[in-house]
Amino acid sequence: MKYYAMILFMFAVASCQTSTVVKKLKGCDSLVITFNHPGTDSVLQSVSTTETKAIQKIAGFLDGKAVTPGSCDFNGNMLFFKAGRQVLPVVFKYSSDNCHEFVFDLDNKVMSTKMDNEAADFLKSLSGGKNWY
C-alpha cells in the first residue's frame, strides 16, 4: 500500500509542476506578435499587448508536445518582454494544416512544440484584425 501511495504522490507532484517555458515567461509584462507576408520575412502586421491575462494565455500555448521542426515557412514571431528586456523570441507556423508549431530557444536548446487548434485559430483571428483574448 505504501508503494501505491508513493507513486500516487509522485504523479500528483509532477502534474502540479509548471513547465520550464511557462516559468521563464512568468512575469512578462508585454508581448509583440508580428505576422509576415507569405514566404518572406517582411512584416505584414503587428499586434502588441500589455494585458497580463492575454500574455499568460499565449505563453500557455507554447507548452505543447515536443515535435520535430517541420519544413514549412514561418508565419511570424512573438517577442515576450519583462521590464523592457526581451525574455523569449518565438517563431510560429500555422497556415498549413500539417505544420502547426512554435520554435524557440530555451536555455540554449532549440525547442519545437506542437501548436493546438485553439492557438492556430487565435493567431488566424489576430492576423485577420480581430483583437480578442
What residue ranges belong to the model's regions?
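Positively charged n-region of N-terminal signal peptides that target proteins for export
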Residues: M1-Y4, Q17
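Sec-dependent N-terminal signal peptides
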Residues: Y4-A12
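Function-determining sites in protein domains
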Residues: C16-Y133
